[in-house]
Structures are given as C-alpha cells and as structure tokens.
Amino acid sequence: MAEYDLTTRIAHFLDRHLVFPLLEFLSVKEIYNEKELLQGKLDLLSDTNMVDFAMDVYKNLYSDDIPHALREKRTTVVAQLKQLQAETEPIVKMFEDPETTRQMQSTRDGRMLFDYLADKHGFRQEYLDTLYRYAKFQYECGNYSGAAEYLYFFRVLVPATDRNALSSLWGKLASEILMQNWDAAMEDLTRLKETIDNNSVSSPLQSLQQRTWLIHWSLFVFFNHPKGRDNIIDLFLYQPQYLNAIQTMCPHILRYLTTAVITNKDVRKRRQVLKDLVKVIQQESYTYKDPITEFVECLYVNFDFDGAQKKLRECESVLVNDFFLVACLEDFIENARLFIFETFCRIHQCISINMLADKLNMTPEEAERWIVNLIRNARLDAKIDSKLGHVVMGNNAVSPYQQVIEKTKSLSFRSQMLAMNIEKKLNQNSRSEAPNWAAQDSGFY
C-alpha cells in the first residue's frame, strides 16, 4: 500500500546508511517497482565508500559492465583505507594495552585518561583527529562495528567542547542501530538527547532540527528495544520540546506514537495516555492523518464504531507495509479490538455476540472465544448467555471517589514528567556542536 508509505518523508531526516534497511524492506514487500528501488540504492551509495555493494547493485540494475569510475573509486578507497590504517595502528595498540583498558573502565574523566595516555604512550592531541577520521571512514565503508569501537575511544577522550564531539555521538548511534545492538543504541540515544537538550549555544531553529533528526533516528531503537514503547510515549508525548518538534516538523510521527500507545503492555498507562493522545491527534488532524490515527479519532472522538471497524481493516495494510511497525501487527489488532469492545461496553449493558463480532471484524465463534479468554484472564467483568447469544456486562459503575483517585493519578503522572523536564533544563551544560555525522561528505538523505 504505497499510498500510506512514509519512507520518503522519513528518509529526509536520516543518514543515508540508515535508509538502506528501509529500501531492503520495501523491496521484499514489492509495493514499488524493483528497478526504481535499485536505482535509489545506487544513488544513495554514490556518496559512500561501499563500492563493492554499489557494484552488486549496478549488476542487478544494468546488464552492461561495471563503469570504470566505480572501479577507480574502489582503488582509491582501498588506498585511503590502508593509509588511515597505518596512521591509526599505533593509536589502536595503545587501546589494546590491558592497563589502558583498566584505566578506561575505572575513570570517567576524559582529561585524566588523556594525561595517562600522554605519559605512558606519548598520546598527542592530533591523534584524536586521526581516530575520528578513521572511525568515519570505517563507517562510510560499511564497517559499523569498527566505527562504533573507534568512536567509543574518541568519545571517552574528547571534551564536550571538541568540534567533533556531537558529531561522534550521532555516528556511534547510527553504528549501533545498523548492528542492531539495541541496548547500546538506547544508551547512545539517551546520551545524544541529553547533549541536544543541554545545548544553550544552538539557535532555536538548530535545536528544532536536531530534535527532529533524533525523533526519526529513535524509531529504530524504540520499536526494537524491550522498553521502547514506554520510552517513545514519554519522549514524544510528554516532553514539550519533542512534541512541539513533531507538531511543527513531522506530524507523520503521530503514526508511531499512536501505535506505541495502542500496543503498550501497561493497561493502566495505556488508558491514561490515550486521553492526551486523542487531543494531539485532534489538533493535528488537519496536517496529518492515516488509518491508524483515524481509528483513534473514530473510536474516541466520534464514537463511530462502524468507521473504527473499517479503519482497523485498513490499519492492517498500513502496519504490514511499515518497516518500523510490521512486528506490532498482532499486538495492535488485539488491543484495538479490546478498545472497540471496551468503548462499546460503556454504552451497552447487554450485547449480542453477532453484533459484537461484526464490530470486531470476527466470526461469532471467534468473538465468543475471544470474550471467554478476556473473562478468564480477568480483563473483563461479564457473563456469556450462550442460549440467547448475549454478553451481559457486570456492574462497572465507577464511584465519584474512584474517579477523583484516577484523575489525581493522571495529574500526578503529568506533574512528575513536568518536574523532570524542568530539572533537566536547570542542569544545562553548554554544548555547541550541531549533529553533522556523515554530513561533511554524504549529508543527511
């Protein structure tokens, strides 16, 4: 379903290396012409050092021989790599020393570590630039593990004021994402976010741009890390600077926020967050909508159950063709049906199983089994009258006291998030660089 594909929009905020997994996914889904996708890969590869990959793509796209320019570029890249390896070899040997490793693990002070290396191994300031260049070259060649390793060494040693400090954080995050090291990527994402948020030198426009990039890069982490669906809600919905970036620069991100809320495993948090999400979806409905956001609008704004059922069917097609959301399909459908059911039950005391099956896009037998499982798992206070084919709801009236308690809990949660954001703002550190990893040569695609 190319109509709802967001790859082109998202790719504008990603480093070109991060776009390759998205193109591979689209190729498998066959929703675009394969030759167009191959040409897209070739265009992306033109400004990287992954020459062998470019040659393979060229062979698949064209029947003629590999262009001379590509062969020449390969020779140049190999020569540059050998030169950088020779320059970096003495530096790498320093880090391979067991005593250096112990020092790196025991001290968090980059200056102290730098002084130690200078005393013991003759480490010099220019070695940092050499290390950074080599890490970046490794990244451009597609050796992400090497890039991550050298960028870690670089980050440990450089002060926050170094001209490549922020750039190296972007590179480390990209490398960990491309290696699918989700724990390390989550740590790097958190570190990068703190650096951006504490930067008092960047202009508001630069900060907005940095946060917009971070929002898009974070999708890889949030939809693969076990805690990702909690963290994405806290960041996108309850941190005003990031919600503002979404509303200003990339309202299409609401698709991912909505999916994270619907598939969140914490039922209490999910219900609490839904009210705030609905407000944002309503505010932005004039700038962005798709079946996923429209499903929420149909159900919680218009109480249009037929419309919600129709949108849920469309959501399946959207999810299965979305690189980030395809793994959420089962959770989404299951929880969306539960949302429809819960909302429907607030209005009706006695419900026909046939009517319910129609609302949930299930057969009557499937609907009955589904409700039985809900009752068995203590997620539903109801009884089934098999003779009449009815579901009779229990007495779910909420006392005024309970309503006050629930509203207080919600207010407490929001106050806590606000206090955390204020505390972070007060503890600002000055950082001056803009996120330009892979931007000097290849730019953000």
Curated annotation (Swiss-Prot):
Residues 9-195 are annotated as: Sufficient for interaction with TRIM27. The keyword Acetylation applies. The keyword Nucleotide-binding does not apply. The modification Phosphoserine is found at residues 399, 442. The modification N-acetylalanine is found at residue 2. The modification Phosphotyrosine is found at residue 445. Residues 221-398 form the PCI domain. It is found in: Cytoplasm; Nucleus, PML body. One of its GO terms (biological process) is formation of cytoplasmic translation initiation complex. Residues 4-128 are annotated as: Sufficient for interaction with EPAS1. InterPro entries: eIF3e, eIF3e_N, PCI_dom, WH_DNA-bd_sf. Keywords: Acetylation, Cytoplasm, Initiation factor, Nucleus, Phosphoprotein, Protein biosynthesis. GO terms for molecular function: translation initiation factor activity. Residues 351-445 are annotated as: Sufficient for interaction with MCM7. GO terms for cellular component: eukaryotic 43S preinitiation complex; eukaryotic 48S preinitiation complex; eukaryotic translation initiation factor 3 complex; eukaryotic translation initiation factor 3 complex, eIF3e; nucleus; PML body. Its main location: cytoplasm. Belongs to the eIF-3 subunit E family. Component of the eukaryotic translation initiation factor 3 (eIF-3) complex, which is required for several steps in the initiation of protein synthesis. The eIF-3 complex associates with the 40S ribosome and facilitates the recruitment of eIF-1, eIF-1A, eIF-2:GTP:methionyl-tRNAi and eIF-5 to form the 43S pre-initiation complex (43S PIC). The eIF-3 complex stimulates mRNA recruitment to the 43S PIC and scanning of the mRNA for AUG recognition. Component of the eukaryotic translation initiation factor 3 (eIF-3) complex, which is composed of 13 subunits: EIF3A, EIF3B, EIF3C, EIF3D, EIF3E, EIF3F, EIF3G, EIF3H, EIF3I, EIF3J, EIF3K, EIF3L and EIF3M. The eIF-3 complex appears to include 3 stable modules: module A is composed of EIF3A, EIF3B, EIF3G and EIF3I; module B is composed of EIF3F, EIF3H, and EIF3M; and module C is composed of EIF3C, EIF3D, EIF3E, EIF3K and EIF3L. EIF3C of module C binds EIF3B of module A and EIF3H of module B, thereby linking the three modules. EIF3J is a labile subunit that binds to the eIF-3 complex via EIF3B. This is Eukaryotic translation initiation factor 3 subunit E. The gene is EIF3E.
